């Protein structure tokens, strides 16, 4: 789909618009004023995208309208440029979502348009393309030989041609020669906006007024086709041909005779979601019903509320969601259900589809661009009332939101690690506040911050202490791997785990093994010189992958075929170390050759729909053992799984991050909770070289309250969230010394502003220091940590410093960003 814009700037109305412009820098980002040509007066609306001339060269760029206002004396009209085109028939963002974009700019230190692009499906974006064509009636004899060839080429096309096509066909590196021909009057150029994905349409046929005429001679096939089209009043050409057994030649003949006309009807690229009318109503336990009633009371209050649904693994939190949704779905308010991993989406969609059918839309990155665009349009048109998806689902374009549910709310995948660096929980709070809606945060292991707020009354608290039905929490054994090695066990599996795996295989029960490291071996070192094989672009060791016999970097994607030669000393003495999911899968296959083993990690699930196929296959009993990374630990419900094994706990505990204990406790509790969810009792084995560690003991007991009471004291003593916010200022550049200098210069600038403008502001500053992985993709990374209160004064201070620092040309090659409450510090 394309949009061609015309020059209509001479006839301007008395209307101006404030426009957020794409690809601006944070330093210079603002809402820019433009005049509205009179031809566009009835077309412009807040939330529509426009094409505008921008900068000294008047380069065409996309923007989105934030405000409309009459021409005012405050802005000299003669200095304003005019918009070139209106791209959208309808606004793509509501006033609420535009307000959200302003919120995101302030809180996440991004540009307006970065926030806007985050909310829109990629398929709806336009690409601005320059085209060149020949001017008629010019004498090309004065052109150079190369210019004449270009002129003849374009003349033969009889229409303007995209610049990329011309450059490719003539082997040109740039458009200099084309621009010279434009200036000389031989060529003209125009700009067109092409959308990345077109709407899906179906060719339809409908009868004209002549269809009832008896004076036109028809064949039997033509008569049968015309009768069917008249009977339906309009139907797809494909269906007409199918039911009458003809080809499109017959319909084309009717079209030429003037008896039918063709038109396109929009269709949606979505999978079938059929409601199961035979399903029994959702049955809740007494605890579940109490929680559901409490949540509904908050929903019905028509004020913004946040509630924490805290329930042990297997307590039936999903059933509470569905019952609550059944009670509110007919209130004409949007419902958003978020899950942290794509791997959880298929089970959720399957479960919810059986209850709610085509009222569901799905938002996540595994969908094609066309599918994502169509789901977005279904929601915007009011055809779907429930959106299920990952982090991006929080931006679903409902006119009014009534309920947002965040399952496994503690998961870090809800936090974006690229600009805008938002947390879906904060976006959900904004939307619920704007629409007086209810936000439900659900988890068996809530984030420390969320449970703290629930205990202190900022959130309401609903608790489920028992597993649903007859299921009980699994028995947990902590295996001491030191003792295993002393006893001569050289495998990565304790005797207790092997014994229970053997029992499950003999009794047709399923098992899950968690190892949160993909690849075969996690590092490769040289026996002679002791040097590890590292990525040339990053300060990190390469991981060996047996599937393709390559050593790969999990940061930048660099890979190299495996050879036995050490790149440092050139001896053939490389040895493998560490265990990844591929190696665990291989070793289990050797120990149990008859076992059907499925590996599930990002290497194995890279293709579209692979998650769903794997989960379905395991749920159907086609595999005995599931080996995977953290994506197998959360939210999945397999009643036949009675054994869970955690192969390596220790490296998670001792990560260089204040959240490592919380992450480890949550992951262990969640994966242990996958066992024994059906009628059979479950078992879990946690393997560790530090079996007496307090976090492991509490996770084995599934004792969140004990973990919380310990962790909250540490957080308070160390001034970590929720007692302070932690803002990470990141610096990245190709020159290490320049990047270090930039970090120190930023610190001086920040301290100077803070002392002069906010002398009473409580701040603690750490660094600058190297990032945990100092070099990634040939760029050196440094960080500055600021413990603060994330309020308007602090954000204003930081924004002013970032803008001032960004104007310093000395550090133009160093990128700087701010990340509030970053995942790792």
Locate each region found by the language model.
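Short amphipathic alpha-helical segments
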Residues: 30-32, 236, 725-727, 780-782
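Inter-lobe coupling/hinge segments of SF2-like helicase ATPases
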Residues: 278-285, 289, 302-730, 735-740, ...
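C-terminal structured "cap/appendage" subdomains that terminate the fold
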Residues: 761-791, 798-801
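Extracytoplasmic/periplasmic
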Residues: 737-752
């Amino acid at each position: 789909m394309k949009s061609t814009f015309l020059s209509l700037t001479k006839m301007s109305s008395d209307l101006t618009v404030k426009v957020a412009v794409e690809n601006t820098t944070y330093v210079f980002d603002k809402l820019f004023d433009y005049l509205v040509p009179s031809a566009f007066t009835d077309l412009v609306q807040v939330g529509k995208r426009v094409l505008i001339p921008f900068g000294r060269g008047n380069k065409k760029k996309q923007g989105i309208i934030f405000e409309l206002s009459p021409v005012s004396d405050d802005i000299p009209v003669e200095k304003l440029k005019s918009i070139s085109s209106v791209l959208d028939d309808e606004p793509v963002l509501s006033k609420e979502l535009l307000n959200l974009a302003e919120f995101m700019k302030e809180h996440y230190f991004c540009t307006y348009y970065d926030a806007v692009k985050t909310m829109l499906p990629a398929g709806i974006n336009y690409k601005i393309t320059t085209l060149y064509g020949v001017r008629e009636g010019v004498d090309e004899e004065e052109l150079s030989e190369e210019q004449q060839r270009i002129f003849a080429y374009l003349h033969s096309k009889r229409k303007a041609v995209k610049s990329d096509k011309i450059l490719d066909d003539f082997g040109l590196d740039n458009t200099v020669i084309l621009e010279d021909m434009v200036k000389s009057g031989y060529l003209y150029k125009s700009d067109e906006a092409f959308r990345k994905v077109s709407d899906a349409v179906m060719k339809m046929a409908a009868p004209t007024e002549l269809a009832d005429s008896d004076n036109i001679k028809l064949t039997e096939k033509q008569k049968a086709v015309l009768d069917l089209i008249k009977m339906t009043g309009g139907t797809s050409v494909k269906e007409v041909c199918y039911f009458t057994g003809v080809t499109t030649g017959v319909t084309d003949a009717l079209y030429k005779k003037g008896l039918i006309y063709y038109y396109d009807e929009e269709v949606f690229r979505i999978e079938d979601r059929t409601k199961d009318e035979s399903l029994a109503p959702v049955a809740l336990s007494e605890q579940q019903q109490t929680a559901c009633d409490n949540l509904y009371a908050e929903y019905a209050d028509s004020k913004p509320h946040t509630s924490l649904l805290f329930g042990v693994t297997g307590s039936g939190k999903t059933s509470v969601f569905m019952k609550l949704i059944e009670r509110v779905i007919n209130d004409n308010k949007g419902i958003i259900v978020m899950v942290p991993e794509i791997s959880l989406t298929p089970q959720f969609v399957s479960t919810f589809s059986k209850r709610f059918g085509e009222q569901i839309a799905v938002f996540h990155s595994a969908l094609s661009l066309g599918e994502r665009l169509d789901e977005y349009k279904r929601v915007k048109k009011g055809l779907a009332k429930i959106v299920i998806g990952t982090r991006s689902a929080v931006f679903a374009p409902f006119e009014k939101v009534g309920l947002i549910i965040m399952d496994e709310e503690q998961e870090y995948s809800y936090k974006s690690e690229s600009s805008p660096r938002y947390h879906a929980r904060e976006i959900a709070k904004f939307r619920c506040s704007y629409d007086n809606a209810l936000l439900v945060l659900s988890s068996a292991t809530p984030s420390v911050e969320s449970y703290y707020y629930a205990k202190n009354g900022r959130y309401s608290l609903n608790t489920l202490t028992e597993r649903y039905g007859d299921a009980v929490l699994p028995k947990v054994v902590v295996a001491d791997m030191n003792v295993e090695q002393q006893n001569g066990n050289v495998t990565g599996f304790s005797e207790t785990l092997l014994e229970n795996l053997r029992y499950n295989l003999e009794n047709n029960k399923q098992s899950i093994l968690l190892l949160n490291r993909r690849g075969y071996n996690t590092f490769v070192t040289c026996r002679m010189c002791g040097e590890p094989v590292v990525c040339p672009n990053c300060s990190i060791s390469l991981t060996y992958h047996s599937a393709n016999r390559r050593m790969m970097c999990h940061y930048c994607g660099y890979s190299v075929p495996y050879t036995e030669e050490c790149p440092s000393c050139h001896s053939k003495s490389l040895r493998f170390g560490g265990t990844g999911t591929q190696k665990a899968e291989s070793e289990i296959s050797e120990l149990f050759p008859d076992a059907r083993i499925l590996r599930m990690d990002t290497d194995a699930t890279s293709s579209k729909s692979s998650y769903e196929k794997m989960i379905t296959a395991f749920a159907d009993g086609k595999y005995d053992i599931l080996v995977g990374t953290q994506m197998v630990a959360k939210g999945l419900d397999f009643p036949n799984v009675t054994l869970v094994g955690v192969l390596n706990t220790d490296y998670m505990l001792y990560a260089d991050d204040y959240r490592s204990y919380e992450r480890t406790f949550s992951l262990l509790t969640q994966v242990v909770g996958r066992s024994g969810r059906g009628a059979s009792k479950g078992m879990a084995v946690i393997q560790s070289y530090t079996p007496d560690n307090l976090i492991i003991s509490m996770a084995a007991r599934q004792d969140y309250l004990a973990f919380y009471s310990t962790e909250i004291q540490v957080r308070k003593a160390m001034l970590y969230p929720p007692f302070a916010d932690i803002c990470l200022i990141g610096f990245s550049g190709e020159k290490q010394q320049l990047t270090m200098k930039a970090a120190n210069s930023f610190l001086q600038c920040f301290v100077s502003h803070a002392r002069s403008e906010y002398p009473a502001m409580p701040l603690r500053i750490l660094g600058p220091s190297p990032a945990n992985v100092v070099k990634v993709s040939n760029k050196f990374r440094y960080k500055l940590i600021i413990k603060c209160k994330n309020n308007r004064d602090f954000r204003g201070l930081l924004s002013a410093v970032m803008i001032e620092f960004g104007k310093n040309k000395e550090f133009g090659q160093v990128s700087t960003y701010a990340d509030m409450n970053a995942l790792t510090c």
